[in-house]
Curated annotation (Swiss-Prot):
The keyword S-adenosyl-L-methionine applies. Gene3D superfamilies: Vaccinia Virus protein VP39 (3.40.50.150). Disulfide bonds: none annotated. Pfam families: PrmA (PF06325). The lineage of its organism: Bacteria, Pseudomonadati, Thermodesulfobacteriota, Desulfuromonadia, Geobacterales. InterPro entries: Ribosomal_L11_MeTrfase_PrmA, Ribosomal_PrmA_MeTrfase, SAM-dependent_MTases_sf. It is found in: Cytoplasm. This is Ribosomal protein L11 methyltransferase.
């Protein structure tokens, strides 16, 4: 007989996500999922896009479930008003078969073509590449980013246009998708760094699955030796500005710096933050509300 799960869905103020997620993990003994929270972007500003978020947790449907649901409802009613929701809706419960829970989300992912050559493909999807296609396989169930968000697409398109015959540094590598693309586009050496060791572990698994070699480390940016033909950073706008000097220092003479993860409304803030670096703003590309800045260093 198939095992079943109780999927508990809560509609809460976005600012309450961390508080509720911690409570749900403790209450259920399992992880949680958050709907409509982009995994490929790193801007805290996006929290304002949807003031209400959907958080889902998964419980074993045992004799204690009703008691746990009552405790959850009390927790939401007690804390939500402090986050601006005076009358939060009670959580809802749906029964799922284990197979549905484990694989149902896969229907939302399909092979995605980016630029002229790059294709991001879920591991389970059949795909017949065209001549010249550079295919990157990802399992979004384990990855920190799937490559489908505009910030990542803008980075990948800029990287493809530049070509990567030299060395590439990927700052905030996440799932490693940009690092893998750089290798497949012909980079001689690729270094990916991330402050999160879990992200680095995932990136290493993804690189191994795709048969590519990249140096993936948790080394702070300032401590990474050498300079690079291309430096990529798809991170918080505030962090881009804070790290402007260190990012610039890693760009080789004549090299390029690609900055993404920037909301269009924050574009001028980032540009102003790089005025003193001596880099030249060579190109600005946008997709929807997102912006990507391409800088070049002097010779």
């Amino acid at each position: 007989m198939d095992k079943t799960w109780a999927e508990v869905t809560c509609e809460i103020p976005a600012a309450m996500i961390d508080l509720l997620a911690d409570f749900l993990v403790e209450l259920s003994g399992n992880g949680v999922s958050i709907d409509n929270l982009e995994l490929d972007t790193f801007s805290l500003d996006t929290m304002d896009e949807a003031p209400v978020k959907t958080v889902r947790a998964y419980f074993t449907p045992d004799d204690e479930l009703e008691e746990k649901l009552a405790a959850l409802n009390r927790f939401i009613q007690e804390h939500a008003p402090a986050y601006g929701d005076a009358a939060p809706a009670p959580p809802t419960v749906t029964t799922l078969r284990e197979e549905d829970w484990a694989t149902g989300w896969r229907q939302h992912f399909a092979p995605t073509r980016i630029g002229r050559k790059l294709v991001i493909k879920p591991t389970w999807e059949p795909f017949s590449p065209e001549p010249g296609d550079l295919v990157i396989e990802l399992d979004p169930g384990m990855a920190f980013g799937t490559g489908t968000h505009p910030t990542t697409r803008l980075c990948l398109e800029a990287l493809e246009k530049l070509g990567t015959a030299g060395d590439v540094l990927d700052v905030g590598t996440g799932s490693g998708i940009l690092a893998m693309a750089a290798v497949k586009l012909g980079a001689q050496r690729v270094v990916g760094t991330d402050i999160d060791p879990d992200a680095v572990a995932v990136a290493r698994e993804n690189c191994a699955m795709n048969g590519v070699t990249a140096e993936l480390v948790t080394t702070p940016l300032a401590d990474i030796p050498g300079q690079f033909s291309v430096v990529l950073a798809n991170i918080l706008a505030e962090d881009l500005v804070r790290m402007a000097a260190d990012l610039t220092a890693k760009v080789a003479p004549g090299g390029f710096l690609i900055l993404s993860g920037i909301l269009v409304e924050r574009e001028s803030y980032v540009i102003d933050g790089f005025v003193s670096t001596g880099l030249t703003l060579a190109e600005t590309t946008r997709e929807g509300e997102w912006s990507c800045l391409l800088y070049q260093a002097g010779q």
